[in-house]
């Protein structure tokens, strides 16, 4: 796709608000994502403007004549269905999945339940509400175990627990961010991620990225603010493994009813090379360290053209019909 791609009429996109910042724990990252998207869209001739919901009421979007929104918000009140619901009421098309899919994907526990019911592989888990239950989960799931808030992103509030004595502190940290705490079996192996673009039968996976972080610690700092993490795209995985990851993430995306774009995180167990879905991000990062632009670039889509393509896919649940709002759950 190029600036002059006849499929996308830039003028028809109208006045665009890039929603960035917000009030979640991921505000800083969102501002970086939104700044990059804003610059990219303007470079393609889009009438794009920054809009921070932390400083302006969403109702102002209608009053100021915005015709669509690029959601570059991350975390709560950004990719959890709340902003999407407000935009539905305002009648302003927005990027990414709709209200229900966004809400479900933000909830890691609900997401895992749906994936498991659909036969998709995801690590065993327990939902806990106390440090004692966390200790019990550790005894059942074994070491190491991941403890994290059910509804946060960017590894915020996450602890890798290797001993029973760590359970209380790990629970307290996660519970600071969410009353629902997820204890998840740790999968030892290759960490990968894979973006998806499109909707329903047209949804397609982009190239897989393999991630190598220092001591396997792909935390908030290593994700966004250091250059020590290594990203491999092409992934270097056997072709059959890459195809299987792409097949699984597209099915996971469709099962949740996603549209527009998302990025799924997958671990490949070292012992038998089996892939396990960890979570799906419905408003992925678009910073200089972000992975969707990296994967898109490997498939020949530049950062500005990626932003333009995502923006052009903006829609409303109300425009989809019931089947479309559910993402068109066709078999893969």
From Swiss-Prot:
UniProt keyword Ribosomal protein present: no
Taxonomy, superkingdom: Bacteria
ATP-binding listed as a keyword: yes
Protein name per its UniProtKB record: D-alanine--D-alanine ligase
Pfam families cross-referenced by the UniProt entry: Dala_Dala_lig_C, Dala_Dala_lig_N
Annotated family: Belongs to the D-alanine--D-alanine ligase family.
Main location: cytoplasm
GO biological process: cell wall organization; peptidoglycan biosynthetic process; regulation of cell shape
Listed GO MF terms: ATP binding; D-alanine-D-alanine ligase activity; metal ion binding
Species of the source: Acidovorax ebreus (strain TPSY)
Associated pathway: Cell wall biogenesis; peptidoglycan biosynthesis
Reactions it catalyzes: 2 D-alanine + ATP = D-alanyl-D-alanine + ADP + phosphate + H(+)
Binding sites annotated in the UniProt record for Mg(2+) 1: 265, 279
Binding site for Mg(2+) 2: 279, 281
CC cofactor note: Binds 2 magnesium or manganese ions per subunit.
Keyword set, alphabetical order: ATP-binding, Cell shape, Cell wall biogenesis/degradation, Cytoplasm, Ligase, Magnesium, Manganese, Metal-binding, Nucleotide-binding, Peptidoglycan synthesis
Record-linked PROSITE patterns: ATP_GRASP (PS50975), DALA_DALA_LIGASE_1 (PS00843), DALA_DALA_LIGASE_2 (PS00844)
EC number, UniProt record: 6.3.2.4
Protein's cellular compartments: Cytoplasm
Gene Ontology cellular-component annotations: cytosol
Disulfide bond residue pairs: none
UniProt binding sites for ATP: 138-193
Free-text function comment from the UniProt entry: Cell wall formation.
Ranges of residues in domain ATP-grasp: 112-312
């Amino acid at each position: 796709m190029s600036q002059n791609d006849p499929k996308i009429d830039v003028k028809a996109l109208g006045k665009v608000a890039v929603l960035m910042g917000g009030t979640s724990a991921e505000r800083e990252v969102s501002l970086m994502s939104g700044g990059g998207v804003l610059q990219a869209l303007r470079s393609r001739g889009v009438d794009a403007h920054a809009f921070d919901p932390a400083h302006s009421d969403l109702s102002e979007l209608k009053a100021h004549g915005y015709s669509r929104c690029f959601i570059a918000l991350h975390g709560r009140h950004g990719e959890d269905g709340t902003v999407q619901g407000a935009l539905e009421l305002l009648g302003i098309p927005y990027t990414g999945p709709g209200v229900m899919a966004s809400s479900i994907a933000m909830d890691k526990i609900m997401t895992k339940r749906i994936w498991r019911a659909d036969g998709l592989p995801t690590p065993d888990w327990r939902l806990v509400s106390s440090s004692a239950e966390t200790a019990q989960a550790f005894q059942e799931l074994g070491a190491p175990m991941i403890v994290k808030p059910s509804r946060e992103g960017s590894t915020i509030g996450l602890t890798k627990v290797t001993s029973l004595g760590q359970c209380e502190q790990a629970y307290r940290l996660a519970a600071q961010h969410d009353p629902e705490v997820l204890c998840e079996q740790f999968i030892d192996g290759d960490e990968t991620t894979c973006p998806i673009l499109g909707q329903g039968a047209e949804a397609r996976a982009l190239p897989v990225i393999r991630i190598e972080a220092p001591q396997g610690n792909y935390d908030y700092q290593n994700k966004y603010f250091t250059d020590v993490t290594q990203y491999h795209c092409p992934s270097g995985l056997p072709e059959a493994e890459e195809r299987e990851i792409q097949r699984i993430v597209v099915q996971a995306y469709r099962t949740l009813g996603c549209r527009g774009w998302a990025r799924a995180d997958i671990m490949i167990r070292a012992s038998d090379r089996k892939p396990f879905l960890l979570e799906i991000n419905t408003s992925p990062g678009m910073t200089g360290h972000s992975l969707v632009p990296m994967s898109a670039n490997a498939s020949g889509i530049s950062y500005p053209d990626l932003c333009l393509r995502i923006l052009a896919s903006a829609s409303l649940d109300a425009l989809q019909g019931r089947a479309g709002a559910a993402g068109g759950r066709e078999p893969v």
